Amino acid sequence: MAGIGAVALLLLNVFYGAVNIPMSSVWSILCGGSDTNASWRFIILESRLPQAITALLTGGALSVCGLMLQAVFRNPLADPSILGISSGSGLGVALVMLFFGGGISIGNLSFGGFAAVLAAAFVGAMLVTLLMFTLSGIIRSNAMLLIVGVMTGYLSSSVILLLNFFASADGVRAYMLWGMGNFASVSADRLPVFATVSVVCLITSVMLVKPLNVLVLGPQYARNLGINTRRLRNVILLVTGLLTALTTAFCGPIAFLGLAVPHIARLLLRTDDYRSLLPATILIGSIVALLCNFACVLPADGGVIPINAVTPIVGAPVIIYIMLRKHL
């Protein structure tokens, strides 16, 4: 049912938008018809369809990242941003937009615009991921590693604030727009790269269900069964870091999906069996992201709402409910 819901929402995102296109024409374009309006064809194939697929993949990616991090750190509030990966990505973008004037030059190689932002976001996120990956070999305690991640995030945020203070008004505005998040940055020509890396990482995460099922019983129990918990933690850090870097670089920092969706999946399935919980989390994350994306384009005449204005409306009540349920 969840899979059918995801497909239905994907089609809804393709059929509906700021420009009113007849349903028959949309369907004809999707089926390869050539007798439709050229501008409508461009809107569907170059904008709406890539945006819907991006929302589908990003929702699943960030949600499964949150689920795996919550399992590894045994912390229900762990999510991709808690390790400082999103902040590292934001720092990379801030350096390009606010310090380097929107472009990067390395020797004879120079590039600007979206390419510079994409490269900076990805490099920033992966540098933090590599830092956490390196520290995970030194720090044995998951709690201490979590604290280091939080402090890394605070440090990155502090540098970003300083850059904002000294930057131009145009630079600050550009950075704020990127920070609001959106799924429209992945155009049709960028989608294959985004989709390929996302799908490979999602398949890798599905392959981790058995060790995750053992890990949830406790690290000592997992070690007794022959699970190398440190190696498992490193693999999860690498996969979540890569997914977070990818989605943040292309879409900006998307809030609450990685934190809230795993709990929504647990509430619906009422199980901690990762064989069903992990695939369900990916599907529910995709559904929530598509719903949020659809909500963003509803006020078509007034423009598109930033995705981060909608995701907390979904995520915050879930977290509040979980916290209250544990204390009542």
For every predicted segment, state its role.
Residues 1-328:
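Alpha-helical transmembrane segments in inner-membrane proteins
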